[in-house]
Regions:
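Non-ligating segments of multi-cofactor redox enzymes
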Residues: 1-145
Length: 145
């Protein structure tokens, strides 16, 4: 299965991955509208972290044995049988945050709405996730390892 991998040595912390993720998951799919006009602004599913001088993008690892999936009491976190990606069904999420507490990567967060979790979905339906496609330094790669 292809996954997104961060290359910390190439990340400059520009946060374009966050912006393009937000736009990809917005209603309008337009940067200005998504960032400034939409009332129900979505949460970027990737976040840039910094540790000392090192910056890197953090997103769901789509684990082979996902703790979040095992911990979810409603089945809102599930594995897509076709792609193997670990996905989230917001309609089934009750906001118990078990997925957030059990994720070893810290890659699941509360959505802006506050009552459901938010995580990377690998931009389902796209050949390459928006964060990878728009990274100016190729600090994010989408590949099988």
């Amino acid at each position: 299965m292809k996954r997104v991998y961060a290359r910390e040595d190439l990340c400059i912390g520009c946060r374009l991955c966050e912006i393009h993720c937000l736009v990809q998951h917005s209603r309008s799919k337009r940067i200005i509208s998504a960032m400034m006009c939409e009332q129900d602004r979505v949460t970027p599913r990737v976040k840039v972290e910094q540790s000392g001088q090192v910056t890197f993008a953090l997103q769901c690892r789509h684990c082979d044995e996902p703790r979040c999936l095992e911990a979810c009491p409603t089945g809102a976190i599930y594995r897509d049988p076709a792609t193997g990606a670990i996905l989230h069904d917001a309609d089934r999420c009750v906001g118990c945050w078990m997925c957030i507490m059990t994720c070893p990567a810290g890659a699941i967060q509360r959505g802006r709405e506050g009552h459901v979790a938010s995580k990377c979905d690998l931009c389902q339906g796209q050949d390459v996730p928006a964060c990878v496609h728009n990274c100016p330094n190729e600090a994010l790669v989408f590949e099988e390892r």
